[in-house]
Amino acid sequence: MIKPQIWFAGTPEFATAALDALVKHVSVAGVLTQPDRPAGRGRKLKASAVKARAEHYQLPIAQPERLQESAPPFAHLPRPDIVVVVAYGLLLPQWFLDYPRLGCINIHASLLPRWRGAAPIQRAIEAGDEETGISIMQMDAGLDTGAVWLEKRLPIGEQSASQLHDALMQLGAEALIDVLPDILAQARAPIPQPSSGACYAHKLSKAEAEINWQDDAANIVRKIRAFDLFPVAYSYLDDAPVRFYDGIALSEHTESAPAGTVIEHNQEGIDIVCGSGILRIKRLQLAGKNVVSAAALANGCHLKGRHFARKNQL
């Protein structure tokens, strides 16, 4: 049997598990990843997580700023049978989608057609979805509109975006290895996505992470869980930003204090009045400080009676 020519295109940590799986179970002829980007306070160039992993495996690497038909990557290699794409982050033009013999397939972190787009993990949590999953999709010219080869489901429960990211990263790698033999053998066809049920996971912004204390406590908890990687839910205390990393919603309350008021701060957490219900914060980060538990903070910085507010309400 002739060994298939497989290229891999990906950039962040989420893509590394799929690359690991391909190297372990099949082989990878070349890796595409984004160019090194400035990072950190010193703004020094930093390689992507996928580049670091590809270097570990001593795989050929290409880092084009954009894909040009006049200068295809890995021109010295045979044309690929398939390209596996995972969070690559660059636009794939039609000529590149058609370049591999069997086209390009994508690992997408949602149950398509729900949550097409840039932030499916976060939007699923924010919306209160009970489950999400992985879709292995045949790429076409649309935004995550291609036919689906395989989907695997995963309950969300109380997972944060960081926890769900790691779980879906591994599930995606498993799904890829499960379905890849069928795709390479052309043993069956992918299933077109349903015409109904599509929604879009728009890119995250820092502005939307600011907490509105008039909101329901359960909604705020979902926002905290959804944004724990980026942009991180936040509010203001005496004009200083405070980030929230973990919290739970408590039942309805009879407090007359305004929304945003801290009514209790003890070893259990920081209880804050919301438009409906009480938000109990478990972990947070004061301006210029490290992330700490609310219990640890209670020993040196008691917040009972203080008031959180939106920037435009100070």
Curated annotation (Swiss-Prot):
Enzyme Commission (EC) number: 2.1.2.9
Record flagged with keyword Transferase: yes
SUPFAM superfamilies, per database record: FMT C-terminal domain-like, Formyltransferase
Pfam families: Formyl_trans_C, Formyl_trans_N
Catalytic activity, reaction form: L-methionyl-tRNA(fMet) + (6R)-10-formyltetrahydrofolate = N-formyl-L-methionyl-tRNA(fMet) + (6S)-5,6,7,8-tetrahydrofolate + H(+)
The protein's role, per its UniProt record: Attaches a formyl group to the free amino group of methionyl-tRNA(fMet). The formyl group appears to play a dual role in the initiator identity of N-formylmethionyl-tRNA by promoting its recognition by IF2 and preventing the misappropriation of this tRNA by the elongation apparatus.
Keyword check for Repeat: no
Sequence similarity: Belongs to the Fmt family.
Gene Ontology terms: cellular component: cytosol
Xref: HAMAP family: Formyl_trans (MF_00182)
Residues given in the record as (6S)-5,6,7,8-tetrahydrofolate binding sites: S110, L111, L112, P113
Name of this chain's protein: Methionyl-tRNA formyltransferase
Enzyme class: transferase
InterPro entries named in the record: Fmt (IPR005794), Formyl_trans_C (IPR005793), Formyl_transf_N (IPR002376), Formyl_transf_N_sf (IPR036477), Formyl_transferase-like_C_sf (IPR011034), Met-tRNA-FMT_C (IPR044135), Met-tRNA-FMT_N (IPR041711)
Keywords: Protein biosynthesis, Transferase
Organism per entry: Dichelobacter nodosus (strain VCS1703A)
GO terms assigned for molecular function: methionyl-tRNA formyltransferase activity
